[in-house]
A protein has these predicted regions:
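S-adenosylmethionine
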Residues: 1-182
Length: 182
């Protein structure tokens, strides 16, 4: 397979041509995960360390969470939250394939799980050293790759995404330990 380093991410590999990912050597053995180059940068910027407690607030499909686990050398704790339990099944399938042992899934909307200052789930009761919040977005940034999206976006849907992002930021910031990073 002809491949080379990506232009920005220090951990990325770019294939010379497209192919079936699941047929690539090492895929089934969990030696890599396919992710956009920009997505690879986020876990690197969070500067996680082995032994830390980390929250991946909008986790599915799990690429960033499994990357965090690798950076943590599979030591510590990652709580992966997503609104859709079916999407968390995909996160856990990726964890099994990649050998991630430190991730615990939690299905639910963080805005409801944390609420108005009341943490309603024991996995969220202790503060986190690091929090990754890749909040759901409008998708406007990928219109070049998915131009059909312009037919589905409305000013109202964009405003709803913005409001959700603000609410998620407010909720996750309350879960961060003093001196932690979000």
């Amino acid at each position: 397979v002809e491949a080379g380093p990506t232009s920005i991410s220090e951990v990325g590999i770019q294939l010379a041509r497209s192919c079936s990912v699941i047929d690539l050597p090492g895929y089934a053995e969990g030696r890599f995960y396919v992710e956009d180059e920009a997505g690879q940068l986020i876990p690197l910027l969070l500067d996680v360390q082995p032994g830390q407690r980390v929250l991946d607030a909008c986790s599915a499909p799990g690429g960033k969470a499994t990357h965090l686990a690798a950076l943590m050398e599979n030591r510590g704790e990652i709580v992966a939250v997503d609104r859709a339990s079916a999407r968390l099944d995909l996160v856990m399938a990726n964890c099994r394939r990649l050998g991630v042992k430190i991730l615990t899934p939690l299905a639910g909307d963080l805005r409801a799980l944390v609420g108005a200052g009341i943490v309603s789930h024991p996995m969220l009761s202790r503060p986190f050293d690091r929090i990754l919040l890749d909040a759901p977005c409008s998708g406007l940034g990928v219109l070049r790759r998915h131009p059909e999206g312009k037919w589905y976006k409305t000013p109202e849907s964009i405003a709803q995404h913005r409001q959700m992002q603000v609410e998620l930021l407010a909720v996750t910031s309350r879960l961060l330990r003093p001196g932690g990073e979000l």
